Every structure is written in structure tokens, then in C-alpha cells.
Amino acid sequence: PFREGCVGESAAAHEARVSGEAADDEALRRVLAGIADDEERHALTAWKFMRWAVTELGAVARDALRDEIARLESESSPTRFDQGELSRHGVLDDDARLALRAEVVRDVVLPCARALLVADAGQVPLRAA
């Protein structure tokens, strides 16, 4: 749930949002914005599940989450990208997608995951990426 839901869906939402903002075609921008909205809802569901797991399963879930945080922190990914020519058509190249994923992990996933470990579940604000 954490890798696919929290990380994957958050990254997919950000990728769709950035792709849509870069697209020249208005219809494509609307489609990609809709996809981004859907992916954000999926990510939010995953984060809610993680909050439940940490609260209900206690140490087992917290230890597993700590392991995932450590894995994410040890991964290296590009942190900058040039959107290039394809971006105006709503397409990002592999380097751009990897850089966006790294941005989401750094700015959204890791802070939210750490918050789950230290805050009472009732105090953790959950927002889509």
C-alpha cells in the first residue's frame, strides 16, 4: 500500500498535473487535470489507510513504515529536468518523470510518512499531493 499507493499515486498525480500544465492543447490540459484529480484521490485513500495501519497495527506498521522511509531516502534520482519538446503535447520523458517522482518523495511522501510516525492519527492532516 505504501509504495504503490502513497508513493506511486502521489507521483502519478504530480506527473499528470505538470504534464497538463505544460500541454498546449486545452482539451488535453483538461483531460490531464482530471487524471491528476483521480490520482490525488487514490493517493489520499492510500494515506488514510497508512494512518489507520499505524494507529491500529502499532509497532509492526511503524517499523515497516520506517523501513520504507529509509529505502526512499537511500534512492538516488534526478532532481531537475528539462521538459523538452514533448511536454507541449502532455508527454514527459523518463528523466522528467524520475525527477518529478523524486520531488514528490522529498516534498510530500517523506514529510507525510514521518508525520504518521510522530503524530497522533487524529492530528495528522491528510491532503492530496
Indicate residue ranges for each PLM-predicted region:
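Non-heme di-metal
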Residues: 1-129
